[in-house]
């Protein structure tokens, strides 16, 4: 991205009218607060977990700019399945790409990246302490101006059509009790140009290929937010 392109992008995300996230964002928060079983499907991804009674927090520009996510957290031992992330990430100064995690009873039991060196570094981080192999956050991103990963998590976790799944420390206001020095937001984009994917709440399809498909959440889709 050129300097001029970044300037335009930065001004767009900073001057966006964040009040447009309401009421769709509040509806998503309510759905997450009331949900039990989450099922996420996509390219080399099939995850199941529960967020029952964990709570959910809406982030609509009050504390961060850019913003645009609602987060919760899986019950610690409820995560099963696997996920292939498709957004690059930097953690502790190291660049990672192609991270794939496999879960059993909430714990990451297999973790690889796109090279032997990256896989070794990834597992060193996940072995930092007893909580680093458990998930501390699940969040859905919907900022219409943030569309491509740029290796800056303040931006990348808000990518429209994405979600992130976070090994390590949970937040107090959506807590599953997991404690760790690690909090590593890993992003998967589910738009068609990134392989698509689906998110289900209690067997109801909520989002398909990055677009919300239930009436009360459609206001969070880019074509609605950018009107």
Task: Walk through the language-model features, giving the residues of each.
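Long, well-ordered mid-to-C-terminal structural blocks that present hydrophobic/aromatic surfaces
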Residues: 75-127
């Amino acid at each position: 991205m050129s300097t001029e392109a970044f300037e335009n992008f930065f001004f767009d995300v900073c001057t966006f009218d964040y009040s447009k996230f309401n009421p769709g964002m509040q509806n998503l928060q309510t759905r997450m607060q009331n949900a039990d079983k989450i099922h996420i499907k996509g390219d080399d991804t099939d995850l199941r977990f529960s967020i029952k009674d964990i709570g959910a927090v809406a982030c609509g520009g009050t504390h961060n700019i850019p913003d645009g996510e609602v987060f919760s957290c899986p019950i610690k031992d409820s995560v099963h399945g696997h996920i292939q992330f498709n957004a690059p990430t930097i953690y502790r100064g190291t660049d990672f790409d192609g991270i794939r995690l496999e879960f059993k009873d909430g714990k990451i039991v297999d973790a690889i990246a796109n090279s032997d060196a990256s896989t070794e570094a990834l597992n060193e981080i996940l072995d930092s302490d007893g909580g680093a192999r458990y998930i501390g956050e699940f969040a859905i991103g919907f900022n219409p101006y943030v569309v491509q990963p740029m290796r800056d998590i303040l931006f990348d976790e808000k990518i429209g059509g994405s979600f992130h799944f976070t090994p390590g420390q949970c937040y107090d206001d959506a807590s599953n009790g997991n404690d760790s020095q690690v909090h590593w937001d890993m992003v998967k984009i589910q738009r068609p140009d990134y392989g698509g994917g689906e998110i289900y709440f209690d067997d109801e399809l909520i989002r398909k290929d990055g677009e919300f498909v239930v009436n009360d959440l459609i206001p969070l889709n880019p074509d609605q937010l950018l009107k």
